[in-house]
Amino acid sequence: MVRRRRLRRRISRRIFRRTVARVGRRRRSFRGGIRF
């Protein structure tokens, strides 16, 4: 939980969108639809 918040604050929105696009598919399968 805390890591997610820190990542959102540190990572800019542009990079965050790219990360979600790449990792989002993997994380969705792992955590069942929960984003970064």
From Swiss-Prot:
Domain of life assignment: Viruses
Disulphide linkage map: none
One GO MF term on file is: DNA binding
Question: Which keywords label this protein?
Answer: Capsid protein, DNA-binding, Host cytoplasm, Virion
Record flagged with keyword Cell inner membrane: no
Q: Where in the cell is it found?
A: Virion; Host cytoplasm
Q: Is DNA-binding set as a keyword in this record? A: yes
Which cellular component, as a GO term, is one annotated location? viral capsid
Q: What does this protein do?
A: Mediates ssDNA packaging into virion, it locates to the internal surface of the capsid. Additionally, plays a role in viral attachment to the host cell.
What family classification does the UniProt entry report for this protein? Belongs to the microviridae J protein family.
Under which name does UniProt file this protein? DNA binding protein ORF8
